[in-house]
């Protein structure tokens, strides 16, 4: 061994002590100490703390460190979590009520649910680098259209309850009789669905009438009806005549339908329904103690422009080939704001993809066989119980029977408990039992033994089971497109999944510098527990003694989030940031009502706010009043004072984002809060930019009363290509009593206040990700993450500001965790639009930053703390090379219309075509930077034509000829 190596080895040995080596913050935060020093030098600063002192106003800084547990190591945290998981008891749950155990095909679990190539992508705003996901979502829409028998479907909603509430709002929006204010809900709907619908109705002044669909006297005061199919107690009812009755009085009919049942039973469309809603959970998604699961929403073509949620449509690209895209975006909150069809942005893309793949893997025959097997097991069970003297209350059923157990009910439940089986318990002594895909002969024998029935020849009975009665039987075909006929072996399925994955750019490819989106690392260790059965196989309505592990996670996470936000209480129920906004505003509304100030209905919102803000305010029943911004991007204090004073008697709230959507820490934020409070209002803080606050300041310190957090931004839940998300809210002490409750579960605030999500704790299984993240980082790690997010953003701003002016800075010349680059001058000087730069970045291997928000013609960049200096430099180099291309257009070196920017992105097919008629070389199109020779991401399509797609709307799979 030479002396140099000996000295190096000795030095390394001296450094290694007893401390654990698998610490996490150094894995999560991109820049190392040397890189940090280089970045600070570029900024002319001597330390990160000096940067923070200049960027973050001293008046809002926390006086002490966060009181959180010491950071754990990756190995240790998984050991600890296994111990917590063991406190959950995994019973066989036959509770039903819209939630079912299912078998998740391994090829789908491993290659989608557990694959960062799928779960780290962003919402497919940039269509050219999202074609894989878009195709999977188009498959989902086609699946929903076929099974429901309706004409158009969106690409998922948050859950069944939310979808039903959205259906009510659509019916209300399109009603022809402006005086109609009543909405009928069948008492046979799932209780949690009714709960969410009633919550949504109250602020809008809608009167929900719950009752028997057979006896209700509909009249022109009703604008809509909601039915459950099959009913929550298992009854299968043909609603055709009732739907006709509703149409006779001008009411829109919605059917909440079980997708698997629709493979055997008459579809909602066949019954004349206008809307079908539901959940795709039993198509390959774990129970997860309530979520996440993909809700669905299908309707008639005439209502397409009033639909909520994302809609995938077929268009064409620059080469005339088919290209998929988000369609009819003018319906959505980021454009229509308080006039939007819904406040929902992030939905459940990853879960919708999984459900569509489940349908593809099994195909129509496979799904029908699964449904038939469940129906046969249920029929045998019902027949044997009847023969034993038990009364079954529903004559026709699919998978659920309700049993009148009488005096034996407690004995039966005790025997079920001894076999680790859950049933649904009704208050009137009935028992509900719902069978599912996982049930086998041994399970059925156990069920019969619970009812003291033994020695039954089940296999013989299986042969003799009658089919679904003709009057209920489905007569129409479904899933006829070749995609549902072609991938039934694991090899073919694996290759199809991989093919689609290769068409999408995710964090496995490069940084995704989307402003206000916080596309940070979603670490593998954080993701591990999501698919553990101790968490994944728990029914949301399982008894509390079976969910002690979840209780520990919820209590600890709520405590940690209270510490981070400076608030007194947290609700984890909202299953998206949009729902967090809605829940927070409802808490404010209820607070004012409790003080006999229900007349407070004005919500002040800065003009720069996220589009969800005004959309959520409208949902919560508030009147939106817009507040101006000054030339520096801050809230205009004089305008705020004037409008707060003008509405002093009816001011309910101000919604504000901090740091602002302009990427700066406003110096006057505490004064802003004081102005609103002095006029009787509450301050709602949008937590979209919380990644710049953690450990440095907090909503509570600033003076806010409520704030939603995006766990899928700040706290590492992956975006999933457009969901799932989690949007918990933190509130000050006086608002704690007004947090959302749930009709089926008593939580910390009771259940007097209605639910905003179908499940009591929303998307419970993925809050584990945020729990692990906080436990791994600890107080110091979280604060350093915040510091580095601010450092990275300022480094990019500094490197690019000479050629791309940074539109807004704080008073000391620094930005927060994101910056806005002004590209507007290039439109005049070179005819180059911001979209041209965004699409050209694809050729360099990058997802574009946020385009034209909050200022048209700009790019908003948020690099997050997870990106290394090498990646930041690569992005900056791409932007600088693009600037040179713009100069080449300006000085005539490149043509004004035929140039790499206008023709971007360039596909492999384009640059290898026999014909190349462009005025620049192929190599400049394909390899504009040296690093691309080492690794190149190729877009699958050229630039997609948005206008063509909306004018020629197609939202289901194209015929097979289009693929030839």
Swiss-Prot record:
Key word Nucleotide-binding present: no
Protein name per the record: Glycine dehydrogenase (decarboxylating)
Stored InterPro entries: GcvP, GDC-P_C, GDC-P_N, GDC_P, PyrdxlP-dep_Trfase, PyrdxlP-dep_Trfase_major, PyrdxlP-dep_Trfase_small
Chain's role: The glycine cleavage system catalyzes the degradation of glycine. The P protein binds the alpha-amino group of glycine through its pyridoxal phosphate cofactor; CO(2) is released and the remaining methylamine moiety is then transferred to the lipoamide cofactor of the H protein.
MF term (GO), any: pyridoxal phosphate binding
Catalytic activity: N(6)-[(R)-lipoyl]-L-lysyl-[glycine-cleavage complex H protein] + glycine + H(+) = N(6)-[(R)-S(8)-aminomethyldihydrolipoyl]-L-lysyl-[glycine-cleavage complex H protein] + CO2
Quaternary structure, from the entry: The glycine cleavage system is composed of four proteins: P, T, L and H.
Keywords: Oxidoreductase, Pyridoxal phosphate
Cofactor(s) the protein needs: pyridoxal 5'-phosphate
Record-level GO cellular component terms: cytosol; glycine cleavage complex
Source organism of this protein record: Leptospira interrogans serogroup Icterohaemorrhagiae serovar Lai (strain 56601)
Disordered: annotated segments: 1-21
Ranges of biased composition (kind: Polar residues): 1-11
Gene Ontology biological process terms from the UniProt entry: glycine decarboxylation via glycine cleavage system
Residues recorded with modification N6-(pyridoxal phosphate)lysine: 713
CDD domains, alphabetized: GDC-P
Entries under NCBIfam families matching the protein: gcvP (TIGR00461), PRK04366.1 (NF003346)
Family stated for the protein in its record: Belongs to the GcvP family.
Matching SUPFAM superfamilies: PLP-dependent transferases
Enzyme Commission number(s) of this protein: 1.4.4.2
């Amino acid at each position: 061994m030479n002396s140099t190596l000996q000295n190096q080895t000795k030095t390394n040995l001296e450094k290694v002590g007893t401390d654990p080596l698998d610490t996490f913050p150094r894995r999560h935060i991109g820049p190392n100490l040397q890189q940090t020093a280089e970045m600070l030098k570029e900024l002319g600063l001597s330390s990160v703390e000096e940067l923070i002192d200049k960027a973050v106003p001293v008046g809002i800084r926390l006086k002490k460190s966060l009181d959180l547990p010491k950071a754990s190591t990756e190995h240790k945290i998984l050991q600890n979590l296994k111990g917590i998981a063991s406190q959950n008891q995994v019973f066989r749950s036959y509770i039903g009520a819209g939630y079912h155990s299912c078998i998740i095909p391994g090829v789908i679990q491993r290659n989608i649910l557990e694959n960062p190539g799928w779960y780290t992508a962003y919402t497919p705003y940039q269509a050219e680098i999202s074609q894989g996901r878009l195709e999977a979502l188009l498959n989902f829409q086609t699946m929903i259209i076929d099974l429901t028998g309706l004409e158009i479907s969106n690409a998922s909603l948050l859950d069944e309850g939310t979808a039903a509430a959205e259906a009510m709002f659509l019916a209300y929006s399109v009603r022809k009789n402006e005086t109609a204010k009543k909405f009928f809900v069948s008492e046979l709907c799932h209780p949690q669905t009714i709960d969410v619908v009633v919550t949504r109705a109250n602020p809008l002044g809608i009167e929900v009438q719950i009752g028997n669909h057979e006896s209700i006297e509909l009249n022109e005061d009703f604008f809509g009806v909601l039915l459950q199919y099959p009913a929550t107690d298992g009854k299968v009812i043909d609603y055709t005549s009732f739907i006709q009755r509703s149409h006779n009085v001008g009411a829109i009919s919605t059917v909440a339908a079980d997708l698997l049942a629709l493979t055997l039973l008459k579809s909602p469309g066949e019954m004349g329904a206008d809307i079908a809603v539901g959940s795709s959970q039993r198509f390959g998604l774990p129970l997860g103690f309530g979520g996440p699961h993909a809700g669905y929403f299908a309707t008639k073509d005439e209502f397409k422009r009033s639909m909520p949620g994302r809609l995938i449509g077929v268009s064409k690209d620059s080469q005339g080939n088919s290209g998929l895209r988000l369609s009819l975006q003018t319906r959505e909150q980021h454009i229509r704001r308080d006039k939007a069809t819904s406040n929902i942005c992030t939905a459940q893309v990853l879960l919708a993809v999984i459900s569509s793949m489940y349908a593809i893997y099994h195909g129509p025959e496979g799904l029908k066989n699964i449904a038939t097997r469940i129906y046969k097991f249920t029929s045998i069970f019902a027949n044997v119980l009847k023969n034993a003297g038990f009364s079954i209350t529903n004559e026709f059923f699919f998978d659920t029977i309700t049993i009148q157990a009488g005096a034996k009910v407690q004995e039966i439940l005790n025997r079920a408990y001894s076999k680790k089986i859950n049933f649904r318990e009704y208050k009137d002594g009935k028992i509900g039992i719902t069978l599912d895909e996982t049930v086998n002969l041994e399970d059925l024998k156990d069920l019969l033994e619970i009812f003291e029935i033994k020695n039954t020849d089940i296999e013989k009975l299986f042969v003799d089971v009658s089919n679904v009665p003709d009057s209920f039987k489905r007569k129409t075909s479904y899933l006829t497109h070749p995609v549902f006929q072609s991938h039934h072996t694991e090899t073919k399925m694996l290759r199809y999944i991989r093919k689609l994955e290769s068409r999408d750019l995710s964090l496995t490819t490069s940084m995704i510098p989307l402003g206000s989106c916080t596309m940070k690392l979603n670490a593998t260790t954080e993701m591990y527990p999501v698919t553990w059965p101790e968490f994944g196989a728990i029914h949301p309505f399982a008894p509390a003694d079976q969910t002690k592990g979840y209780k520990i996670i919820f209590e600890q996470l709520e405590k940690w989030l209270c510490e981070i936000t400076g608030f007194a209480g947290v609700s984890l129920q909202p299953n998206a940031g949009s729902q967090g906004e809605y829940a927070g505003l409802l808490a404010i509304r209820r607070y004012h009502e409790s003080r006999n100030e229900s007349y407070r209905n004005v919500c002040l919102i800065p003009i720069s706010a996220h589009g969800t803000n005004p959309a959520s305010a409208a949902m919560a029943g508030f009147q939106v009043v817009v507040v101006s911004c000054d030339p520096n991007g801050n809230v205009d204090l004089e305008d705020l004072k004037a409008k707060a004073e003008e509405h002093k008697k009816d001011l309910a709230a101000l919604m504000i984002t901090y740091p602002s959507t302009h990427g700066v820490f406003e110096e006057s934020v505490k004064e802003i809060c004081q102005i609103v409070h002095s006029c009787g209002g509450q301050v709602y803080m949008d937590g979209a930019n919380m990644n710049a606050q953690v450990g440095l300041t907090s909503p509570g310190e600033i003076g806010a009363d409520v704030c939603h957090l995006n766990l899928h931004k700040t706290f590492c839940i992956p975006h999933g290509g457009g969901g799932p998300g989690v949007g918990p809210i933190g509130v000050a002490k006086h608002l704690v009593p007004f947090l959302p409750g749930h009709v089926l579960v008593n939580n910390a605030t009771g259940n007097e206040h209605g639910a905003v999500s179908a499940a009591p704790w929303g998307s419970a299984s993925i809050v584990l990700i945020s729990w692990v993240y906080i436990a791994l980082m600890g107080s110091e790690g979280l604060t350093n993450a915040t510091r580095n997010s601010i450092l990275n953003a300022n480094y990019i701003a500094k490197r690019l500001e000479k050629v791309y002016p940074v539109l807004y800075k704080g008073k000391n010349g620094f930005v927060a965790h994101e910056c806005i680059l002004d590209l507007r001058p290039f439109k005049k000087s070179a005819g180059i639009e911001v979209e041209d730069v965004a699409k050209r970045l694809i050729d360099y291997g990058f997802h574009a930053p946020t385009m034209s928000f909050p200022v048209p013609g700009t790019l908003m960049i948020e690099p997050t703390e997870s990106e290394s200096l090498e990646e930041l430099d690569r992005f900056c180099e791409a932007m600088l090379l693009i600037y040179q291309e713009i100069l080449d257009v300006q000085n005539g070196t490149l043509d004004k219309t035929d140039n790499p920017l206008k023709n971007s992105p360039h596909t492999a097919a384009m640059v290898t075509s026999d014909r190349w008629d462009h005025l620049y070389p192929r190599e400049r199109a394909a390899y504009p930077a040296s690093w691309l020779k080492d690794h190149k991401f190729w877009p699958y399509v050229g630039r997609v034509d948005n206008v063509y797609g909306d004018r020629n709307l197609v939202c289901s799979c194209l015929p097979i000829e289009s693929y030839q």
